[in-house]
Amino acid sequence: MSACVAIIAALPREVKALVKGWESSSPARNVRVWTKGNAVVACAGMGADRVRLAVQAAMAAKPVTTLISAGVAGACDPRLRVGDVVHVGTVVDARTGERFEDPEYTQVLVTGAEVAGVAEKRRLFAAYGASAVDMEAAAVARLARAHGLSFAAVKAISDGAEFEMKELGRFATVDGQFREMAFAGYVAVRPWMWGRLMALAKNSDAAIAALTKELEAQLDWYRQRG
């Protein structure tokens, strides 16, 4: 069977540039799928529960052989900077302690249940030597194992280890979406947050640009494998 890679991300904005010009569909509410050749990208929202829907949609669209968990992530290692790409060697599920290993790489990604603030990033760095933290990779890895598929994870840093992000969690919906208008309204009446919001937007753009470049390179590699 030819290699067919499925990239699983949380939100469409993380892959918008990557999938420009691809065929797109929405098989269910807040589930988006894009296909091109032997590649598929799927998003269904933030968190482990939404990962299952994204993976199901990807596998329904193509005969998937590899799952890649991709997206932006928060740095736990203070040496990492915005736009740095993390090639994950170990995914740790913070809730269960499960580990998913890729011997090709060494960096550690911890998957948590909510957006991590500075204190949690510090704790994860101390406890696991974590490079970064996300909310989806462990669920993608678990589903890859269950279906006998290859797995990889690649993340781009959108917020440094000392950049506070915890309040973003209150704007996540039950189906893993981000309430952008509600967040904008929250910040609008808190002028002391405006500078941090502008930095967050700039940092997110830089992270997504780096992620897009990395994923394009990985897709080229899979295409060459045939």
Q: Where do the PLM segments sit?
A:
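Extreme N-terminal starter segment of soluble prokaryotic enzymes
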Residues: M1-A6
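Short hydrophobic segments within beta-strands
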Residues: I8-A10, A42
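Helix N-cap/beta->alpha junction signal
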Residues: L11-P12, A137
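Short N-terminal binding/cap micro-motifs at the start of the first secondary-structure element
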Residues: E14-L18, R50
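Short, aromatic/basic amphipathic alpha-helical patches
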Residues: A17-S25
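Glycine-rich phosphate- or other oxyanion-binding loops that anchor nucleotides, phosphorylated ligands
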Residues: A28-G226
